Each structure stands twice: as structure tokens, then as C-alpha cells.
Amino acid sequence: QSQHRNLTIHIGCDSIVRGGTVWYVTAVVFRYGAHGAHFIFSKVNVPSYRKYDNKPDIFTRLFQEAVYTLEIANFLIDNNIFMKEDIVLEFDYNDMKITKSTPLVGAAAGMATSQGYNILLKSDLQMACKAANQICQSC
């Protein structure tokens, strides 16, 4: 268990397309109750996803954000760094109105909750996704 009773770990990912490259930033936010937070992040880039007709494949790009988020969370659990109850996964998918990310809400929420994680969606107060978005802007 975490040494700090009020510590929660928020993990979220955002992406941005620049030219023919997709940049993914996954942020891990250490939230100390009402006493502030800090974060670390990883940044990777891959070639832009395309459909068979050469149009951008937005679904694959957005789904990969959930995959990166879960990979980091599982790494932290598998290596006994944190416990699941300390972790909140954030998915930057809109559950309040219809957008390109809306179809991913069920898939991402299902993957995460079936593994026992707590989640936040775009309509919730997110820290990790906002931090990741901020870093994405400089990619």
C-alpha cells in the first residue's frame, strides 16, 4: 500500500498528429489529497494510422491512448510499485455528447473496470489527461 494515505495515482494519455506522425504522451500524476500534485510522463511517436482508403484512422489512434494508459497501470501493479486501489485511470473520451471518441467509452471503461481499476472520463475532473494534453502541444 502507498506510504501516503492520501496519495492517488492518476494515469492518462493524450495524442496529437503532427505531419505523418502520431505523438502519444502518457502522464502519471501523483496527487497528495489537497496538498498538491506532480507528474511524470512518457512520450512516444509512431507513424500516423491510415485506413485502407488512406484516410486517417482516428479510432485506432484514440484506442491506443487507452492501451498505453492500461500498460502503465499494469506495469505499476505488476512490479508492486502501487496497488490498484491507489490508481485512477483517466480516458479522454467524451461520455456527455457525441464526438469521435464517444464509441470508445464502453471499450475503454470495460477493459479497465474488468481489471479492477477505477476510471474517470472526459466529463470528470481529469489531471493526467490534462497534463498529457499540455505536453502534446509542444510535440
For every predicted segment, state its role.
Residues 11-12, 16-43:
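Acidic, metal-ligating active-site segments
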Residues 91-127:
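Short, low-complexity, polybasic intrinsically disordered segments
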